[in-house]
Amino acid sequence: MKSATTLVLLAFVGVLHAQMPPALVNAERAKILEGVKSLPKAGAPGPIGIWGNMAFPILSAPDKDGVEIAVAAAAGYAKGRVILFGHNSYLAGGEGGDHAKLMENCVNWAANKEKPRLGLKGVNAVNLYKQHEFKVETFDKIDKKSLSDFDVVIVNMQGIISAEEGAAVAEYVKGGGGFIGGMTGWAFSQTSGGKDLAVSHGLNQALMPAGIAITDMSAFDQLRSFEARVELPQMMNASEAISAIKKQRDGGPALTAEQMKQGTNAIQIAMAAQPPDRSNLKAAVLAALGTAGADAVVPTAQAPLTADKHAAQRLRLGMETRVLRLAAGEGVAAHPAHEAFPGKVPEGAPRVSGEIKVTPSIPGWTSTGLYAAAGDTITVILPEKLADKGYAVRIGCHSDTLYHLDKWERAPDITRSVGLATATTKTASAFGGLIYIEVPGRAKDDEAFTAVVQNAVPAPLFVLGQDDDAKWSEIKKRPAPWAELACDKLIVSCPTEVARAINNPTQLMEFWKKVVEAQDDITNQTAERKRPERIVADVQISAGYMHSGYPIMIPTSAAPEMTTFGKLKFPGWGFYHEIGHNHQRGNFTFDGTGEVTNNVIGMYCYDAVLKKDWLIGHTAITEEARKEHIEKIKKASNKWQVWKSEPFTALTTYIQLMQEFSWESWRKYLYSFDDPAFGPAPKSDDERRDQFLVRYSKITNKNLGPFFDAWGIPVSSAAKAEVSKLDPWMPKGM
């Protein structure tokens, strides 16, 4: 017999425009969270978009600004029920804590009946669910016949992308079935060969009428666990937020700054899941905001759009950029914000065709020296046999998205990547940008080929070894607003006005080549390198002053330093720091050294490339500063806590090792991880610290145990014993 609460819940299924009352939401959430206090974070989960009238968050956590983001959500859908998790690891129930209990509750809630029959697909957890007295089987095929054997199915959604499978699941749920699914949405592009989650995932799309969906966003970076709470903000549901915003605009209750921030965030997350042909949510947002009028504001560095003062404008612009990113290939109009950034193509700039040599053994972005003007349709042609093999055309190098930031100095998402599914592809960008051919990692065995790009604007592109300084004096006159300079180890992207000030591109790119080669060499990664590093200047980046990755992102204010040989030679610290991040590996980087070992690698550039004192790069490593770090450690009651929380204090430890034992000791340490004589690589932070001590002690033929103790670096007694017969070493002043 169904409970009274269940009957109320079912009664709401047929109501199209009424939200579930908060008391009912809390009652249903309480069932799912019964006996659950917390859930460990599994992997790197992403947020769930929530907008349905019968949808609600199950588990969430606040971001740095206190805005709640859901990692799991539930919804009623016709006669059935759906639960989604932002990572597939949650489906197996094996993360510890109250995880198993949570999944037991999820099955019971989704089944809405006693002793449900449970089917698992892509989830290795038969024994766990049997322990909870469910009748459990695995199944392989998603179709009407297979699904009919179960009351609830738990499905790893990562690879379930066909529309037919999605339709089968949707019909199953509408008929009364329970569906529990999860996937790593932000990784879908990688696992699917470059496809877009909102467009290409048939199952995620099929469940959208329930009003919840997996998104391609990431979140929860610093989180360790999710606390179970029966009461969560109503405004986590985008429909609730849209309704509240509309009521405020119509003279109803005013929203607090916190409510507006929560609501706009919920709408942005929900919009991230929407394919371009699904207009319900978009229409509701536009209705709530009213006509654009004065709201049509273009963000700039001088006049940014802030969360506190420009919530409505940010909602509108954020929605526009999400829709434009997924819009059909042709017929995309230029967005007004493109003129502020990345910039307008000069009037009268010629449109040309270019033949681009593509080397499939070099994955990532292949520069073309061409630019797509905002709103222009470009055509890309590649050999027929390579169509639909994972190659793509990218428009724009400014790949950071800014939706999560409280301040926007440009539109939050301005690049596009479109798969080359056919031999001829037409596409356009509302913002414009440099054009690239994207090469998938799996294409390494393909033969080199030529791609043709038509209706593009010539852009300055200098290639070391192919162009010389005299040729550059002509190349830099090309009209596109963005330019690139390249060598086989690194490519820089900067405003053309900055590039035109360069008169010695050969010297500049030879220098950059040496920087990357030096870091490759000291870290034993020369043979690993498959593609050049990239550094892109942007008016606003997603995190920090600069950040690592592909590409490394820097502010446009740093572009002149990046492209001026004299400035780069000193100080250059930030660039070497970020390239160093890209060279970090887990074997030698443990808790507290994420911002340290990259600096060790970066400092090596001063010695090997600049041929200067390698301690001149930063004021926090001068002799006086290092003395202060040492004194602080001496006085600390908890040396380890100080050491691991202050990067330049920790860096002083490494500096002492280099000063005494030379850079060759660091080289041997990093190379030792490929030397079987040193044993297997570490698998945990405890092992990494132990092996740091043991390997370095053996390399230097000194017992570094007392040195580690002086700095407060915890190592095991076994590790200390292993090096105890060596002569101890301690630097002066310690």
Placement of each model-derived feature along the sequence:
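Beta/coil-rich, acidic/histidine-enriched accessory regions frequently appended to metallopeptidases
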Residues: 283, 293-344, 349-353, 685-734
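Active-site-proximal alpha-helical
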Residues: 239-262, 268, 492, 625-719
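Activation corresponds to long, low-complexity, non-globular regions
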Residues: 219-220, 226-336, 481-500, 509-512, ...
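Catalytic cores of extracellular degradative/oxidative enzymes
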Residues: 472-473, 481-659
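Short, surface-exposed beta-strand/loop micro-motifs that present aromatic residues
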Residues: 66-78, 481-484, 696
